[in-house]
């Protein structure tokens, strides 16, 4: 409702085929705020947060030159939207999550040093230390993930899956940080007023969870499902051969997957880096899960677990990347990477147990 220039996506139809494109489909056009017929006065109220949002109404006559890219780009709006989302969701919401987590970490750090209970500072209490540990752990991961993803975007890439990982992981981890910070700040955090530095971030956390793709949808369908669709070298050729009833092609692709799995298994024995070994094990596990084909869309708990493993691997790499380029604490870096890998091993065991894959018991620990 506050925008002066609006990008409008709509389903373009051309019954008389004036554009010689048949039925063009999703198209994106730019319209100005004061365009005749545009009603732009509806304000939603997302949790009383400063998040301007509202619906657009009206019966508009949009010139064809307002289509982004002109007449030639009629019907290519879906590609535009996906490319924009691939970059955009990796910037705005992760940055917001990063900021709120840093404010909470900084504020709570000083609070537990100064606040005393039972004649001792809060920082000396193990229960507080446990919660603050989670705050630092997740804040560091968010900062590292945002930093590496920004560098990827600055290089001109549009990583759809990586941006989905960073959006989902950063907003979820920021909510964890804020929950722990609220617990430590206790009564001060639930009373509105100028001294409450957490309330506005806590209130806004569900917005980041929801917008630009619900985290539930992103985790269960997008991260692993779309990542598999974009990256696996053999499995979809295998599924196509089944649909085409092509026995020769099926045998060829199945042999490639089998050879790839054996190669990864043998390669894992020669790796001394634990993170690299877990990456190889995940790639091998993916070969087995991918054989489910379209059933992955229905088995969303399995897809979600695989997404968590994939996300943790990316975040572990980002923590090492951040340490390398910023000369940060090696002790903290090793702790976070080890903890992410431990979480992953539990998830890998869970996937193997639920699928009943006895043939890859060597990965089970």
Listing of model-derived features with the role each one plays in the protein:
Residues 157-189, 331-344:
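Charged, glycine-rich active-site and insertion segments that engage polyanionic ligands
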Residues 36-61:
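Flexible, small-/acidic-enriched active-site or ligand-binding loops
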Residues 1-38:
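A short core secondary-structure module
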Residues 114-130, 324-329:
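Terminal amphipathic helices with adjacent charged low-complexity linkers/tails
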Residues 254-365:
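C-terminal amphipathic alpha-helical interaction region
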């Amino acid at each position: 409702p506050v925008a002066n220039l609006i990008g409008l996506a709509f389903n373009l139809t051309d019954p008389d085929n004036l554009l010689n494109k048949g039925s063009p489909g999703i198209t994106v056009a730019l319209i100005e705020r004061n365009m005749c017929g545009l009603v732009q006065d509806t304000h939603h109220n997302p949790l009383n947060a400063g998040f301007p949002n509202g619906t657009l109404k009206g019966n508009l006559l949009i010139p064809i030159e307002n289509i982004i890219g002109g007449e030639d780009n009629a019907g290519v709006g879906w590609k535009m939207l996906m490319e924009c989302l691939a970059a955009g969701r990796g910037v705005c919401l992760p940055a917001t999550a990063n900021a709120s987590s840093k404010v909470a970490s900084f504020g709570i750090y000083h609070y537990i040093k100064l606040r005393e209970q039972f004649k001792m500072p809060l920082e000396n209490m193990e229960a507080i230390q446990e919660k603050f540990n989670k705050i630092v752990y997740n804040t560091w991961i968010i900062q590292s993930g945002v930093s590496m993803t920004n560098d990827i975007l600055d290089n001109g890439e549009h990583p759809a899956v990586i941006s989905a990982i960073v959006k989902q992981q950063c907003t979820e981890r920021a909510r964890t940080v804020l929950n722990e910070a609220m617990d430590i700040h206790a009564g001060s955090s639930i009373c509105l007023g100028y001294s409450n530095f957490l309330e506005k971030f806590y209130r806004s956390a569900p917005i980041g969870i929801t917008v630009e793709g619900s985290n539930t949808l992103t985790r269960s369908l997008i991260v692993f499902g779309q990542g598999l669709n974009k990256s696996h070298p053999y499995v979809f050729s295998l599924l196509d051969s089944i649909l085409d009833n092509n026995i020769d092609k099926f045998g060829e692709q199945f042999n490639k997957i089998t050879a790839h799995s054996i190669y990864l298994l043998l390669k894992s024995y020669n790796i001394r880096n634990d993170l690299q070994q877990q990456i190889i094990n995940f790639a091998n596990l993916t070969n087995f899960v991918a054989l489910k084909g379209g059933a992955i869309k229905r088995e969303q708990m399995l897809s979600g677990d695989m997404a968590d493993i994939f996300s943790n691997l990316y975040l572990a790499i980002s923590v090492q990347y951040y340490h390398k380029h910023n000369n940060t604490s090696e002790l903290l870096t090793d702790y976070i990477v080890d903890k992410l890998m431990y979480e992953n091993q539990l998830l890998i065991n869970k996937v193997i147990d639920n699928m009943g894959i006895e043939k890859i018991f060597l990965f089970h620990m």
